Amino acid sequence: MARREDEHVQLPIPNGWYAVCWSRQLQDGEVKSVHCFGEDLVVFRTRSGQARVLDAYCSHLGAHLGEGGRVVGETIQCPYHAWQYDGETGVCAKIPYCDKIPKKALVRPWEVRERNGFVFVWYHARQKPSSWEVPVLEEVGDPEWTEPREFEIEIPIHVQDIHENNNDPVHFQVVHGMDDVMDTEEIEYSADGRISKLIGHNERVTPMGAFQTTLERESFGIGMSTVRTIGIPGAGLLLFSSTTPIEPNLTISRWLITVTKNLVDLVGEEFQQNLVKGVEDDMRIWKHKVHRKQPVFCKEDKFLGEYRQWVKQFYV
């Protein structure tokens, strides 16, 4: 039996900020090859400590700058003929055997932000400049919070479908067996519409007594989101997730978890274990599902419907 037409929908890559690597993976003078958005990139840290990202291939004869290239000052040097490209502008700054540099000797530079332990780049299908900023997480690096735990995994599905899961409270009960799903209030949107914020509440019983727990989830485009939980007075937990398209239907998800030090750090360990199990549960669905362009929603799918409308702004 032939599949319906909307079962073959291939979503493009949405515009936004995406992490290309962890900051700790990029030491001074280090060069990395990265493949994301269906493109080959070179990521490197200049001698002054700046993270830079350029298209991977030299404008001369097409050598891959990330395979044997090296950092020279604020430039990256091609391994083939030693052409040097400025990390910020992508313009060829030096050809060692030629005094006059051709005007077309350049490679595309990517907008970079290094924050929260990640190196982010701005992706836009039409190469337009960024229209919002990467948030700064005050908890990361705060002496009152634990050293962040890190976790990453590749997922064979489009980035939109991963993010959509967060707006689907029913699946938490069916797929993950969670009986204490939070009561979700309305989803709020920033003035420009780029940030969505969900607030939920439930009650948890602990050895220290019963506590009303509040969850706040903020999504900054499709590429990143934060989850903050507040329950025990004076204590908190932060989960930051970054989802980056490698190809349209292959995504790498990275998570960072930190808790206040007045909580036993086992809380962070338990949260990470639950997160890993949750992803494994979802993977059984994700590996075999199709993307419905026009899904049939029922009355209780309110947040899913709102999400589908919200994400439209991130596509050209």
What are these regions (language model features)?
Residues 9-10, 33, 111-113, 243-244, ...:
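A general structural signal for short secondary-structure junctions and capping/turn motifs
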Residues 14, 106, 113-115, 237, ...:
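A short, structural micro-pattern
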Residues 5, 19-140:
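Rieske [2Fe-2S] iron-sulfur-binding domain
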Residues 15-17, 29, 116, 146-150, ...:
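Sequence-level motif detector for i,i+2 pairs with an aromatic at +2
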Residues 50, 127-316:
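C-terminal catalytic domain of Rieske-type non-heme iron oxygenases
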Residues 1-2, 20-24, 100-116, 211-231, ...:
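Charged, low-complexity, helix/coiled-coil-prone segments
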Residues 1-16:
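Hydrophobic, proline/glycine-rich low-complexity stretches
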